């Protein structure tokens, strides 16, 4: 199955059939009976080992232009994915420093405001750290203390998609422990997939899996009056 568990079919179904939850349950059953697929094993290896992920990403920028060398010369895909046009278009150039290296783990805010946690996800951490940096610094500019634990890992969405229930439990426990050190009042994220996974809104999961409310950064900024501040400029 190529289902991404996006839930689009569920929202459009007049009978609200939980197709994403059914697909996820079937994948867990298949994995339990036959073991992980080849792709599932690769997903588990990457998302379950942060050190390996960092190592592979360091060399990915150099290898990216080679990913499409086997496309037939007659294929129109070469116009879109040729090595000459690939850089900066289809795959972003990997930055020299990831988000963990760009921002501190804790930023002290105003004493009368609570601590908010930041869950960046692998995309903002390793591919778009400049966006992740804004995710960290904007709440701080609003006076909040910001906790960005460097022990956090993958949200578990790839593991859920591959039917790897045990890895989901491992990642969830790791992330719970990572944020427990500062006990934030809520956790902010800018990744829709991470938010859905951590809020328990994907494939029939229920409840905030980290034990803390997870909020999209845009909703947080609106709730804190940023729209009114921008309108007044």
Model-inferred region functions:
Residues 19-233:
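Iron-sulfur cluster-binding electron-transfer modules in prokaryotic oxidoreductases
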Residues 1-17:
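Cysteine-centered iron-sulfur cluster-binding motifs in ferredoxin-type domains/subunits
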